[in-house]
Amino acid sequence: MSMKQPVRVAVTGAAGNISYAMLFRIASGEMLGKDQPVILQLLEIAPALDALKGVVMELEDCAFPLLAGVVQTDDATVAFKDVDYALLVGSRPRGPGMERKDLLEANAAIFSAQGKALNDVASRDVKVLVVGNPANTNAVIAQRNAPDLDPRNFTAMTRLDHNRAMAQLAGKTDSTVNDVKKMIIWGNHSSTQYPDLTASTVNGKPALDLVDRAWYEGTYIPEVQQRGAAIIKARGASSAASAANAAIAHVRTWVMGTDENDWVSMGVYSNGEYGIAKGLIYSFPVTCANGDWSIVDGVDVSSDFSKEKMAATEQELSEERDAVAHLLP
């Protein structure tokens, strides 16, 4: 197999748990293909650089044929130099006694700086995935600070919610995730997200014909919305491996394309589709081809139930954006 030229992949929060579950898989070719060498450009805060050094030692010790180089730094302009992909995983976690507004502001500072650095030094075609929470709003902040880059290059991860929703539906219908098609997560990566089965099928049959409405509204939706909290309760730590898996899948789909007759959920820049306010980064059903995404047209969102759920998560995203509006250019 002839090798391509290496591409540069930046990962922030590179010594953290999600990155630890992700970097080895990127270096093995799982994200961009087995014929695509990568240079990893890893960003951490200064106090974590020693821990990062240990991760890099382990990466070296794997002797990955596709790993063409590693950069370790606490300087965003070094980490983002000429990058083709940027996975923004690092964010400020919510500490004791911290209000949501404080969390938004702390992250606004981080993602403003990263957006500016991407604007200054990244490839003009850089594909950005924000994983660090609140992911949708952090993506808006980075995007607004990168006026020279196409807003379509900035995405937020709702693939984890999408995968959770598929797994729960497969379990309920005694099928496998391979049988589930056309899942949708609308809105924010938060407990207001709307896992919508209106268009979904299981083995070609409409999902809503296979499950009862009371289960769908009363059990399924809240379970998908609150799955992250359930994992923290059970594991004593937040989901890391499943988040890393979803991040890899998000980028791989964006680059390699969606399967025929199926789609995925991605937090992407709204241009007013489905009546959602322009400029929000909102999760829509999308198809991907030739390294680009497009929002699926014509999904039926006419029911009062759908309208209400989509508006509630949009309102939360608008409120988050408004809370940091004074920090946006």
From Swiss-Prot:
Output one GO MF annotation.
Answer: L-malate dehydrogenase (NAD+) activity
- Annotated positions binding substrate: 94, 100, 133, 164
Q: Which transformation does this protein catalyse, written as a reaction?
A: (S)-malate + NAD(+) = oxaloacetate + NADH + H(+)
On the tree of life, the source organism's domain of life is Bacteria
Record keywords, A-Z = NAD, Oxidoreductase, Tricarboxylic acid cycle
- Coiled-coil intervals in this record? none
What is annotated as the active site?
189 (proton acceptor)
One Pfam family hit: Ldh_1_N
EC number of this enzyme? 1.1.1.37
The entry marks the following residues as binding NAD(+), namely 13-19, 107, 114, 131-133
Any one GO BP annotation for this protein: tricarboxylic acid cycle
Which function does this protein serve?
Catalyzes the reversible oxidation of malate to oxaloacetate.
Q: Which family does it belong to?
A: Belongs to the LDH/MDH superfamily. MDH type 2 family.
This chain's protein is named Malate dehydrogenase
Can you name the source organism?
Answer: Psychrobacter cryohalolentis (strain ATCC BAA-1226 / DSM 17306 / VKM B-2378 / K5)
Gene (UniProt)? mdh
